[in-house]
Amino acid sequence: MRCPYCGSEDTQVKDSRPAEDNTSIRRRRICPDCGGRFTTFERVQLRELMVIKKTGRKVLFDRDKLVRSFEIALRKRPVDRDRIERAVSGIVRRLESSGETEISSEQIGLQVLEALKSLDDVAFVRYASVYRDFSHAEDFENVITEINAKIARDPLDP
């Protein structure tokens, strides 16, 4: 594993243990060259998922992009990184275990909304406003009501 501080290729694992969600291994590493310490996570990838965008274009699912979406919605909100990681891991686990190799971006968006609703109401509204491209104040009320109804019915069925 490359050191994120100095770029050295030779880092050592000092501690390994299951992460809180039991879907990954948390490893504490140290770089013998610069003394930098950092944490990595190792996960099982069950299958490669393709995301079907609104335009019909297909792209490889990117877990990091999902994490960034949560981080943007939760910016300056009092939500621990561990809770974000558990939410993302839960979504990825559901997607991978669904049996599908292709999933629409809308289905992923609904799962993100469902997770954000339980994490932070403000983040939920932030994400919904971008997800549904709000242009008027009324859009906030209308779309949140609609999304809540969809999530209550079935979070996997848009």
UniProtKB/Swiss-Prot annotation:
Biased composition (Basic and acidic residues): 11-22
GO BP terms, alphabetized: negative regulation of DNA-templated transcription
Ranges where the ATP-cone domain occurs: 49-139
Sequence segments annotated as region (Disordered): 1-22
Entries under InterPro entries matching the protein: ATP-cone_dom, NrdR-like_N, RNR_NrdR-like
Note accompanying the cofactor annotation: Binds 1 zinc ion.
Superkingdom field: Bacteria
Zinc finger (unnamed): 3-34
UniProt-recorded name of the protein: Transcriptional repressor NrdR
Origin species: Rhizobium rhizogenes (strain K84 / ATCC BAA-868)
Lineage summary: Bacteria, Pseudomonadati, Pseudomonadota, Alphaproteobacteria, Hyphomicrobiales
